[in-house]
Structures are given as C-alpha cells and as structure tokens.
Amino acid sequence: MARIAGVDIPRDKRIEVSLTYIYGVGLTRSQAILAKTGVNPDIRVKDLEDGDLQKLRGALENYTVEGDLRRQEGMALKRLQDIGCLRGRRHRMSLPVRGQRTRTNARTRRGARKTVAGKKK
C-alpha cells in the first residue's frame, strides 16, 4: 500500500478513487489534484512511479486533510458551544442543529427512545 498524508491507500484501485480514502479528499478534489499534477486518473496505485507519488504528496500539502481537518472541525464546534449560541447548545444536547422538527422525527440524532413511566391514576 502506498502511504500518502499518513494514510495507507489501497493499491488495486484507481488513483482517482484511492485518494478519496484520505479524510478531506472527495472525488472532486481528487480529480483536481490529479489534473494539477498531471497524473493519469485511470492508473492503478500499484503502477504509480515514485515521482508521481512525490507530486501527489506535494499537492496534498496545500490542503487541510486528516488530523488537521478533524482538529479544525472539533475546534469550530467547541467554539460554538463556548460562546453559548443556539447551534452550540443544540450540538451539546445532541439535537438537530438546522431547524428540523423534533416532536416526531430526529431519532438518529436523539438516539434510542427513553421510556418514561406513565402517570398513575
């Protein structure tokens, strides 16, 4: 397996698809990187030359990927929670953040049902 940006990318897949195994690189960004470096997107990772791998590593240094990106996202969420805005509070309470209804739906975000005992007569 070739190692790019600290990630072992699969050898038998096309380089265009293999780059998407890196957190922060989707198909569009992968295609842009390959176009910029001049690497054929249809070539398999195992057939890449060392020079091509070095070009790809150099091109990926211009983007925020993997641990740095995860850290940035975590800090953005923490900032929202620290300033006490509605979005931060909703994140903290594990509720939908973007205005969706919660009376009936939002099961994924809220988790499994917690049964509350009924009132006795």
Swiss-Prot record:
Located at the top of the head of the 30S subunit, it contacts several helices of the 16S rRNA. In the 70S ribosome it contacts the 23S rRNA (bridge B1a) and protein L5 of the 50S subunit (bridge B1b), connecting the 2 subunits; these bridges are implicated in subunit movement. Contacts the tRNAs in the A and P-sites. Residues 100-121 have a biased composition (Basic residues). InterPro entries: Rbsml_uS13_C, Ribosomal_uS13, Ribosomal_uS13-like_H2TH, Ribosomal_uS13_bac-type, Ribosomal_uS13_CS. One of its GO terms (cellular component) is cytosol. One of its GO terms (molecular function) is structural constituent of ribosome. Belongs to the universal ribosomal protein uS13 family. Keywords: Ribonucleoprotein, Ribosomal protein, RNA-binding, rRNA-binding, tRNA-binding. Part of the 30S ribosomal subunit. Forms a loose heterodimer with protein S19. Forms two bridges to the 50S subunit in the 70S ribosome. Coiled coil: none annotated. The lineage of its organism: Bacteria, Bacillati, Cyanobacteriota, Cyanophyceae, Synechococcales. GO terms for biological process: translation. This is Small ribosomal subunit protein uS13. It comes from the Bacteria. Residues 97-121 are annotated as: Disordered. Signal peptide: none annotated.
